[in-house]
Amino acid sequence: MAEQIGTGVDSNPDCEAMVRCLPGVSANTEQTQAAIPEQGVPFAETSDLEDCQGLIIGSPGYFGNMAAPLKYFLDQTSPHWLSGALIGKPAAVFTSTSSMHGGQESVLLSMMLPLFHHGMLISGIPYSEAALHQTNTGATPYGASHLAGRQGQPLSKDEISACQALGKRIAALTTQLN
């Protein structure tokens, strides 16, 4: 999903997507993962937020809420909140769940709450996007979503369209605001 959203962002010549992931959270107090992943995209650091002009965050859904690694990351952003570093910047959210009733909308809303506290300008996907009318899997007006199922199904055509539309929308808002 992040790659498809990034494709939407990158379609704007004035914007460049910076895709990041987060390490897992462990009850073990010793380091359980390398500081830099051996493969894939780099881990996000709160310092990445200082340079962003717009922010799109995503998380799998667990019991209708964002995953612990994202919550842990967002809980470390108090210095950015105190300085107002993210005020007025556009933001959006996306999620994937394993079941149709996996709480996609509540997961999306849970990710929005810290962004509201940061003073970010939250945007979803408008109903002018055909994918919202055609999908029978994911995509909501609250943000992009994916119904992965138990077998980890690939993104549907409509989910890809919604992801790219969300990226394009945030890129356009970022350009308009800057």
Question: Where in this protein do the model-derived segments appear?
Answer:
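Short, glycine-/small-residue-rich phosphate/pyrophosphate-handling segment
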Residues: 87-140
